Amino acid sequence: MIKPEILAPAGSFEALTAAVRSGADAVYFGTGNFNARRNASNFSGDDLQRAVDFCHERNVKVHITLNTLVKDSEMSELKESVRRICKSGADALILQDLGVLRVVKDICPDIELHASTQMSVGTLDGIRNLADLGFSRAVLPRELSKDEIKYLCENSPIELEMFVHGALCMCVSGQCLLSAFLGSRSGNRGLCAQPCRLPFTAENGTGHDLSLKDLSLIEYAPILSKTGISSFKIEGRMKRPEYVAAAVMALKNSLSGEYSSENSEDLCSLFSRSGFTKGYYENALGRNMFGFREKENVTSATTSLLKKYERIYEKERAVYRVHFVLSVKSDKKISLTASANDLSVTVLSESLPQKAVNRPFTKEEALLRLKKCGGTVFSFGDADICIDDGLSVSAAEMNALRREALLRLADRLKERAPYRINKANIIFRNRKPNKKPQTYVSFRDTSAIPQNVECDKLFIPLSSKPELFEKYSAGAVLPRGIFGNFDEIVKRLIKSGARYALCNTLDSVAAAKKAGVQIIGGPFLNIFNSVSLSEIQKLGAAECVLSYEMTLKQLTALEGECRRGVCVYGRVPLMLTRNCPVKNGKSCRECGGKSFLRDRKGIEFPVRCTNGFSELFNSRPIYMADRMSEVKNADFVLLEFTTEDKEQISSVLKAYQNGSSPEIEFTRGLLYRGVE
């Protein structure tokens, strides 16, 4: 059994030092603007090279996060960032955006690629898709149960990584728009403002019904290591160095069978939200998973506790046992060879050794000098010593030779074979857009579909009766959450007779492919630039609804052949959750499928459930009927009906036919203001 890697966060150089000296096998951090924690200190310029060298010298791998969506206007900056990272010798890149994937593969085809949890892939066929795209590792969603994790590990063609400690988002990663729509700070762009930690209340709920406790599975590490997981990931690039050190130490202790209540108490004191949860892993969803940062949580980290972990990482940690070969010959310069980790260096004295006047240099004295490796990444292993009789070597000269040898050996440890670095030259073939975009309409509730709907394509949920697909010549909207449910989704899709499917994740793309149904990309594939649009076409999408986070200006400038559309009406799904927030206050029977959460301002956000997942919708629908002339370079527009009744739907459809001004409370979404 291969021991899983301990992968620690590094939001600053001090946190990186804490991770490395506490015993992490690898660290992950961001650089520049293209990472999911843009508010962390991160690393750029000389700091990036310094960080990579620091880690490599200590036999620790470096994974760089490039896991955000990128605008077309940022592509030049992205390419420069990729070149800089690859020149630094980093070991792997963690990616979300399909366009970024293409750019990285063009520039540096040899660097290892990891699929971020932001890609929302949690099925075996989705993981196979990632392998085909060139990923060697996938980071699993936090929402998976132990049985689902075990199944994926047993069958995955690539390495799998999972979170074992840290913050737990309410929403499936990569599927959250709450921060973007409430304040233009996009989680998909590394600037999540965490509005979910503010009061959102279900009827009879906790008052913080979108705020989960932090995850902690560290005590299960020995069991999980037997499943075949390749990497245990600790969340926390915004956390203090002491937190990082404590989490790494606790995970090391757990893997060696030495995990204790002290480890757990320290972690809870350093950072928690009303304690920790194992809910998804144990498939024990419910009210006990929820928690928020109370006053006692904030003040529980004492000075003595912080000092305890500071002492662990403030001193250098020996990583390698060094073997010395010392040769002191009368007719040659003194030679000292130092070897570790299959590397060797040799240093020579400036002059020949002198004849001893009083006491000659001995093996015992040489050993005394060679053993002084403190403050370096080396500890003394052994030594082969050959000294001619009657020679003198001063303590100062011997110490200088040892220091020089260890410095040179440390430099050798930093070295990596350079990557091939190419120019990225992506050329687009453009299509001729329709003079007037086609109209696509999606209905969540099939009983609310008006008679004689005029549209070019009509979508209904996959759970609808097969005769409805035939009646409306409808396409199927595949569920966004299909973890542990993939084969059933494929069977249902085949049985439905749907000719096309709206796919919002790479999991659902894989399901549509398996069912032999035409793929239409959905907005939660997060297609945000011309390159990603081109890449989703290569994956089989005939056309694609663009990300809800794109502006009309970005849409107008978008290049490429793939037919593209934009949502011009509907309540945007702000969250996809595997733990229903409404259940904090009432049962499914009491809910009746028409519940909501209320924020601290009294605004209501509808909640609807399907396929074992809940969706939180925006309080107001996007409305663009009176501004359709401003929607340019789109082949189709999408109207999504979720909470509306038949009469309301008929009224909206008529308004779009007539270009009417709104008579309802509405939003323009992000079509004008965009995201940071």
Residue ranges and their predicted role:
Residues 43-47:
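Glycine/small-residue-rich interface belts in oligomeric ring/scaffold proteins
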Residues 119-123:
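Conserved phosphate-binding/catalytic loop of the ribokinase/pfkB sugar-kinase fold
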Residues 1-22, 26-37, 49-52, 58-86, ...:
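Surface-exposed amphipathic alpha-helical tracts and adjacent flexible/coil segments at the periphery
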